[in-house]
Amino acid sequence: MAIYRFVVRFNRSDNPRALGLLKDAHALGFAELKLIQCQDLYFIEGDLSPEECMRLALNLLTDPVTQSAEWDELPGGRIDLVADVSMVEVALRPGVTDPVADEIVRAAHELGMAGIVRASSGFRYIIQGAVVETAVELARRLLANMVIQRWTIGEIEPSFPG
């Protein structure tokens, strides 16, 4: 069965979540960071048509006024970043309850998308001004809660609740 990765971005880089994380990173001593982009990740397993992916993105996963979404079927294409930009993805550890994912499945079924089997959620952080070592330290100290979340540099593999 197919697994889709939906990436939801804010249309503006000055959204409160990104600005708050950048401020926190600077307070922790990561003064070299220029920008942190916060994006929501949703992994959806099921049989979806392109039209259903569009409906899911527009009607359920985004606020179309402030956000936009893109999606692909896993494995997706490779993401190329420039030299001073790193990407960290964070997701819940296997076995941790994901109420956002539960609601996605429930709401998608209400919208008539019965082909959705399960979902999981996470976050993507694009960090400008960070070499990989800095991104690793930032993930450990700020971006992930190690008790309930796992993280990786680059794209994370989805895990779904049992």
Regions inferred by a protein language model and the residue ranges of each:
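Core nucleic-acid recognition elements
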Residues: 1-162
